[in-house]
A protein has these predicted regions:
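Extracellular beta-sheet/turn segments enriched in Thr/Pro/Gly and aliphatic residues
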Residues: 2-22, 124-126
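Membrane-proximal, glycine/serine-rich, low-complexity loop/turn segments characteristic
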Residues: 22-308
């Protein structure tokens, strides 16, 4: 028996389905956070997003800690571009350019030590495709007027650019102005080692008069320039160059007075006011060749820095 069937097309609209990745994934010692799941309204930079992650704390200076322990390494796509100057990345990479933030517990900076116990914590930033293979950045422009201070007009002008590929990463920044101490904040090394040492200070430890914390009481004119590049030679080898320069010109007032009781019962007050001016230039160049394999480790580093 022959049967002929005539079929007619019909469209059926399906309900919209949205697939979202898990906000948290555990893979051994690595805890991966899908950053978009934690972002809130008004979160613009990577640093804004990091403050939302459970267990992660970002201090006012920009240093990052996890469960109360400061991170010992900050990587972008597995590469240590900035060392302790990672605020340059966290405060300039847009939050929506990051897919995942990985926190690695029991971290080993040297692969040859992987069998040894460790309590170090590191962080690795995974970027979205729109952040790769093309340059991007942001500009900063600000102006205002302050009644008190050396300069009535306060201004800040700067630009930061970066590019990330599979084998090459670059971040550069240039800023100048007379508003607060932005150059010191942006160039801070959260892992230490940013100070200038001499044979005398290495031997005797230097002298500290207990200067007050720097803030608005300093009328600043400062600027900074930095260029950081790392090249991935192979899976175990990198070549990195970091060049920094910062300039600070600051004035502040110091007042002190001493009151004496004279023999006739009267009081004599002696006062002193000092308004010192300091200008500091801080250049630094670091070149690093790193071979970090499971059976071999070589870390050759050349550092040239000064203050004048």
């Amino acid at each position: 028996t022959k049967v002929d069937m005539l079929l007619t097309p019909k469209s059926i609209s399906l309900k919209e389905v949205m697939v979202r990745p898990d906000p948290l994934r555990q893979m051994g010692d690595t805890l991966s956070h899908h950053l978009a799941a934690f972002l809130g309204k008004g979160d613009v930079t990577l640093e804004d997003g990091l403050k939302r992650l459970p267990g992660v704390d970002v201090s006012k200076s920009g240093s990052i800690s996890y469960m109360g322990k400061a991170i010992s390494q900050f990587n972008i796509e597995g590469l240590d571009l900035l060392g302790g100057k990672y605020s340059l990345a966290t405060r300039n990479i847009p939050a929506d350019y990051v897919t995942n933030v990985e926190i690695v517990r029991n971290h080993h900076s040297r692969k040859i030590d992987k069998e040894l116990p460790s309590n170090e914590v590191s962080m690795n930033i995974k970027l979205s495709q729109k952040a790769k293979f093309k340059p991007f950045g942001q500009e900063e422009v600000g102006a205002g007027y302050m009644k008190d201070g050396e300069d009535g007009l306060q201004a800040l002008l700067g630009a930061t650019g970066m590019m990330f590929t599979d084998r090459l990463q670059t971040i550069g920044s240039l800023k100048g102005g007379n508003y607060k101490n932005f150059a010191q904040v942006d160039m801070i090394d959260h892992f230490g080692g940013s100070g200038i040492s001499t044979p005398a200070t290495n031997l005797f430890g230097g002298f500290d008069g207990g200067a007050p914390p720097q803030g608005e009481y300093l009328y600043q004119r400062n600027g900074m320039a930095t260029l950081n590049t790392i090249c991935k030679v192979d899976s175990n080898t990198t070549f990195k160059v970091n060049a920094d320069y910062s300039y600070h010109r600051a004035t502040h007032d110091i007042e002190q007075s001493t009151t004496y009781l004279s023999g006739d019962g009267s009081y004599i007050t002696v006062g002193e006011t000092t308004s010192p001016l300091s200008t500091v230039h801080l250049p630094k160049l670091s070149i690093n060749y790193l071979r970090n394999a499971s059976k071999a480790y070589l870390n050759e580093k050349f550092v040239l820095k000064g203050v004048f």
